[in-house]
């Protein structure tokens, strides 16, 4: 009986949440409600939705990963130490990647350090975290392998990304080209690109990616628990699945980082798909024990 009541309570709470979210989004997307970047501002102190949602996504992902690490028999002190270094490297990598593609917008080093105002690139974060993880495993010789760590990391990363994308929502960024589809999103004129200043409604690409990230998280979670044969398989699948969605969604984005006439995210995603697919085939066909690599 208690289990039934608990299930009904969760179901009712979830239903109310999604009903509220639907109503709220419909008001924002129609332009009836205009968003603020700030949760509150008191004097010189301000708390932004962007940084709060990024932090929320990280914390939820961290606790899910930590539980999985415990089930894997990993030393949790070593796991926490890796996370500490990985987070620092991920933030630096995410910001550095973004700033390098937008140098003309940063007049000083201080401007480049203002990560709470937005401007983080997931590809830079992944590169920074992976490099740090590799060095940590090589130098520290912990209770886990590098690929075991990356599987834990990438199995929960899409969940954090799905939550973090809503920071773009409150910043009125990461939206797509103009559209008249029923789910079109109103963007105030100050946030519109100059070439689209006469348009009011745009693709909510932040929402597309958030939904895709959630789907990837659930797919990877099922694979992690039921079908994984070798460490590294989940990492490869993350590269493939996330990148497939990113390539499609990036086509609609109006604020993409560019390499010449090529969207950087699409180019890097294509490379990751190739690497992930190849790596997955190699790992699935490998006869080496699970702790290899």
From Swiss-Prot:
Compartmental location: Cell inner membrane
Gene Ontology biological-process entries: lipoprotein biosynthetic process
Transmembrane segments: 4-24, 45-65, 81-101, 115-135, 204-224, 231-249, 262-282
NCBIfam families per UniProt: lgt
Functional pathway: Protein modification; lipoprotein biosynthesis (diacylglyceryl transfer)
HAMAP family: Lgt
Keyword DNA repair: no
Ligand binding (a 1,2-diacyl-sn-glycero-3-phospho-(1'-sn-glycerol)): 165
Entry membrane topology: Multi-pass membrane protein
Domain of life: Bacteria
Gene Ontology cellular component list: plasma membrane
Keyword tRNA processing: no
Function as written in the Swiss-Prot or TrEMBL entry: Catalyzes the transfer of the diacylglyceryl group from phosphatidylglycerol to the sulfhydryl group of the N-terminal cysteine of a prolipoprotein, the first step in the formation of mature lipoproteins.
Protein name: Phosphatidylglycerol--prolipoprotein diacylglyceryl transferase
Keywords of the record: Cell inner membrane, Cell membrane, Membrane, Transferase, Transmembrane, Transmembrane helix
């Amino acid at each position: 009986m208690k289990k039934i009541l608990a299930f009904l309570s969760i179901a009712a709470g979830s239903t109310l949440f999604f009903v509220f979210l639907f109503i709220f989004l419909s008001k924002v997307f129609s332009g009836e409600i205009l968003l603020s970047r700030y949760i509150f501002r008191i004097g010189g102190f301000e708390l932004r939705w962007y940084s709060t949602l990024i932090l929320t996504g990280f914390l939820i992902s961290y606790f899910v990963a930590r539980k999985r690490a415990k089930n894997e028999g990993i030393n949790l002190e070593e796991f926490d130490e890796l996370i500490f270094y990985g987070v620092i490297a991920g933030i630096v990598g995410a910001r550095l990647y973004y700033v390098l593609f937008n140098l003309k917008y940063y007049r000083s080093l201080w401007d480049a350090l203002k990560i709470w105002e937005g401007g983080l690139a997931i590809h830079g974060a992944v590169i920074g975290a992976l490099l740090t993880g590799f060095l940590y495993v090589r130098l520290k010789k912990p209770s886990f392998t590098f690929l075991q760590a990356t599987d834990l990391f990438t199995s929960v990363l899409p969940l954090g990304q799905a939550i973090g994308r809503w920071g773009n929502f409150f910043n009125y960024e990461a939206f797509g080209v103009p559209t008249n589809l029923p789910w079109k999103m109103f963007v105030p004129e100050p946030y519109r690109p100059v070439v689209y200043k006469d348009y009011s409604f745009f693709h909510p690409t932040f929402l597309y990616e958030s939904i895709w990230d959630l789907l990837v998280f659930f797919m990877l979670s099922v694979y992690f628990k039921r079908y994984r044969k070798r460490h590294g398989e989940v990492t490869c699948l993350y590269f493939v699945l996330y990148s497939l969605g990113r390539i499609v969604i990036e086509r609609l984005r109006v604020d993409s980082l560019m390499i010449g006439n090529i969207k950087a995210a699409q180019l890097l995603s294509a490379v990751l798909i190739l690497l992930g697919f190849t790596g997955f085939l190699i790992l699935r066909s490998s006869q080496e024990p699970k702790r290899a690599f």
